[in-house]
Amino acid sequence: MKKLLVLVLSVALIAVTFSVNVSAATSHTVVAGDTMWKIAVRYEVGLSEIKKANPQISNPDLIYPGQVINIPSTESSVTSYEKEVIRLVNEIRVKNGLRELKYNWELCRVARYKSQDMKDNRYFSHTSPVYGSPFQMMKSFGITYRTAGENIAKGQTTPQMVVDAWMNSSGHRANILNASYTEIGVGYVASGNYWTQMFIGK
């Protein structure tokens, strides 16, 4: 197990950092049966971000039809970069006889937090001073998995550049081509160009 953990984390740290700008870009009018959790899932936004964007709601457990909920959204250029990384990874996997990884928005959210954490706390490591290891971080965000891995990078300015860098590193390449992974999340922070890829197998 220790050997597997070392392999998963043996990704060479690529040094060369997009700030996740969140703003209330849209709104949702509550209908009967809605809960904050259902709204969060519908818009692929974390529950804590929805609560933060709606300070006017004193008790998030009690929302009523007709109430207007602000929906925070990630800057579109950020999400397009993240989705392009996923597309490129899946293209590589298919060329290598592997199945595509499924986009997991909750895993993308965790990966964004990791990239932001590296920027905010000025470190570049798989181990966060705030969240611990990638595995501890995923679990603390409610992500369940059978197997998991993480790739990080800093400084690459485009999805193609970061994927090329990862593919030229044996540890990163092993994660991208790991047949046991089934889902992927990518988080990008433009300010400093921090990148995080998180993989899980269920």
Regions found by a protein language model. Give the residues of each.
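Envelope-exposed proteins and targeting segments
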Residues: 26, 65-67, 148, 180-184, ...
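Disulfide-stabilized extracellular recognition modules
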Residues: 153-202
